UniProtKB/Swiss-Prot annotation:
Encoding gene per record: dxr
Cofactor list: Mg(2+); Mn(2+)
Protein name: 1-deoxy-D-xylulose 5-phosphate reductoisomerase
Residues binding 1-deoxy-D-xylulose 5-phosphate, per UniProt: 112, 132-133, 155, 178, 191, 196-197, 200
EC class: oxidoreductase
Cross-referenced PANTHER family: 1-DEOXY-D-XYLULOSE 5-PHOSPHATE REDUCTOISOMERASE (PTHR30525), 1-DEOXY-D-XYLULOSE 5-PHOSPHATE REDUCTOISOMERASE, CHLOROPLASTIC (PTHR30525:SF0)
Length: 356
C-alpha cells in the first residue's frame, strides 16, 4: 500500500490496521510531522518517503525522500503497488487522485474533496471510499434495485446542543470538541458547520450515481446510512463510531477480521433522527443547488478552506466560514468547467478573491 497523509488521523489508523494484517507499506508521505514519520519509517520500512517541504529533508531518516506534489507523483509512477490510500487533507489531495487514476491504481479515498471539486473528471477511477457513510451505502446498495432515496447521517458536530445566538462567541477549542469522532482539525470544523455532510452527499452522488439523497442528524452516530425503497421498505447500517471500520473495508481484501465490538441492540439507547436546520447550519442550504450543478464544488470547497483556516488561525469567527462561501458564490456563480485545468483555475481565483 502507498499511504499519503500517514501522520494524520486516517493515516495513523490505517497503519494500525496494516500491521494487523501484515500489509506491506511501500511508501509514506506526510506534511510536517517528521518525528512521527520517522517512527513510521522505522516500523514499516517503506521503499519511498515524501514530505511537503525540502527544508525538513535532512531530518527524515530515509535514503529516498521526495518533496512536494512532484515527489508524490514520482512515487506513484515508480511504485508498483496497486493501492493508494489518499488521506491528504483538502484540495491539496486532488493531483494525487488524478495521477493514481491515470496510472490505473485502486484509490482508497479519504480525500473527499477530490470528488467534490472534480468528480466529473474522475469517472472510471477505481474508488474504495473511506467514509463511514459511503461504506454504509455500499453495503446497503449491493445488488439492490428500486431505490427511492438514500440518507446519510450527521452527528450535528461540536455545536449540536448550542443555541444559534451562541455561535457568535464560540472558540476554536470549542469547535474541535467533536462529540463522537476523533478526527483531524479541518474535518472536525467541517462537521460543526455541516460542510462535511454537504460534501458527503456530493461524494455519494459521484460514487453511486444517485441524486435522490439527503442527510439527517442522528446524534449518537450509531446509524450511518439508510436506504429507502420504492415499495416503502427501508434498510439501515449500524456500527459504532470508529473510522477503522471504513478504512479496513477499503484496504482489506476480506471483511472477516473483528474490527469493532458490534452494536448491542438490547442495550442501545433510543435513537432519534432530526432534520438539519438551515438556520443553524446555513451551508446545508446549498444541497439541492449543488446536486443540480456539481461545478459549484470548486467554488464552495475553496471558499470553505479559506474560511476554515482563517477560523483555525483566529483571523475570523465561526459564522464567517459560511459567509465566506456565500460571498464567493455570489461573485462567481456556477462556473462553466470543461477541463480539469479550469478546476485549478477556479480554485486559485476563489482563494485570491477572498484574500483581496
Amino acid at each position: 500500500m502507498i499511504l499519503f497523509g500517514s501522520t494524520g488521523s486516517i493515516g495513523v489508523n490505517a497503519l494500525k490496521l496494516a500491521a494487523l494484517k501484515n500489509i506491506p507499506i511501500s511508501a509514506l508521505a506526510c506534511g510536517d510531522n517528521i518525528a512521527l514519520l520517522n517512527e513510521q519509517i522505522a516500523r514499516f520500512k517503506p521503499q519511498f518517503v515524501a514530505i511537503k517541504d525540502s527544508k525538513n529533508k535532512h531530518l527524515v531518516k530515509h535514503d529516498r525522500v521526495f518533496i512536494g506534489q512532484e515527489g508524490l507523483e514520482q512515487i506513484l509512477t515508480e511504485c508498483q503497488d496497486r493501492l493508494l490510500l489518499n488521506a491528504i487533507v483538502g484540495f491539496a489531495g486532488l493531483k494525487s487522485t488524478l495521477k493514481a487514476k491515470e496510472l490505473g491504481k485502486n484509490i482508497a479515498l479519504a480525500n473527499k474533496e477530490s470528488l467534490v471539486v472534480a468528480g466529473s473528471f474522475l469517472k472510471g477511477a477505481k474508488f474504495l471510499p473511506i467514509d463511514s457513510e459511503h461504506v454504509a451505502l455500499k453495503f446497503l446498495l449491493e445488488g439492490k434495485k428500486n431505490i427511492a432515496k438514500l440518507y446519510i447521517t450527521a452527528s450535528g458536530g461540536a455545536f449540536y446542543k448550542y443555541k444559534i445566538k451562541d455561535l457568535n462567541q464560540v472558540s476554536v477549542k470549542d469547535a474541535l470538541k467533536h462529540p463522537n469522532w476523533n478526527m483531524g482539525a479541518k474535518i472536525t470544523i467541517d462537521s460543526a458547520t455541516m460542510a462535511n455532510k454537504l460534501f458527503e452527499i456530493i461524494e455519494a452522488y459521484h460514487l453511486y450515481d444517485f441524486k435522490e439523497s439527503d442527510a439527517l442528524i442522528e446524534p449518537r452516530s450509531l446509524v450511518h446510512a439508510m436506504c429507502e425503497f420504492k415499495n416503502g421498505a427501508s434498510t439501515a447500517y449500524f456500527s459504532k463510531a470508529d473510522m477503522k471500520l471504513a478504512i479496513s473495508d477499503a484496504i482489506f481484501e476480506k471483511q472477516d477480521t473483528p474490527i469493532l465490538e458490534a452494536v448491542d441492540f438490547s442495550k442501545m439507547p433510543a435513537l432519534k433522527f432530526h432534520k438539519i436546520s438551515t438556520k443553524k447550519y446555513p451551508i446545508f442550504k446549498l444541497k439541492n443547488a449543488f446536486l443540480k450543478e456539481p461545478n459549484l464544488g470548486v467554488i464552495i470547497n475553496a471558499a470553505n478552506e479559506v474560511g476554515v483556516y482563517n477560523f483555525l488561525e483566529n483571523k475570523s469567527g465561526f459564522l464567517d466560514i459560511a459567509q465566506c462561501i456565500f460571498k464567493a458564490l455570489d461573485h462567481f456563480g456556477a462556473p462553466k468547467i470543461s477541463s480539469i485545468e479550469e478546476v485549478f483555475e477556479y480554485d486559485f481565483k476563489t482563494r485570491e478573491y477572498l484574500r483581496s
